[in-house]
Amino acid sequence: KGDCYVKITVDGAGKEGPVVLDLFGKAIADRIPGPARMPELVRRLPEAGRKAHTEKYIAQNFLGYQYLRGAYLAEYELKGQNLQGFILDCGDTKSAQAVVSRFAFAGNAPAGALAAGGKAFRDRYNGDIQLGWQGRFVWGCTGGDATQRQVLAAAIAKSLKGGKLIQ
């Protein structure tokens, strides 16, 4: 709500768990000013194939890298394959280019040629990653096969364009 993103989860709460979480969440939301909606970049993650309630915000160390900060992500199932799509707002074009360059030269070998969604990398820790970037944004996905990663990365780019965040 407003500029805040709060996600509450619990394990082993029994039947009452969802009811208590809902009441607790509403009590928090009532104290936060602004409209009740997801942050802009969560709304830019495509809905097609997105698994319900998997949206997250990772403030730092996204994918285990200190320089990957402020990632909005969600889990997807496309053609029976599990993927994770993400968007980072790097603040400006220069910072986004620096993030991509640093990732590319961090020992991540190319996993394929330039594609519609950007560039594919083979990350030694996270497997194959499809990255796209334009302006201040970096986006991409992990998991699934190369085709589904390209499809999801292209869908994220299209959604960013639809929100007029990139051209």
Kindly give the residue locations of the regions a language model identified.
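Soluble, non-membrane globular domain cores that form compact, hydrophobic packing
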Residues: 1-167
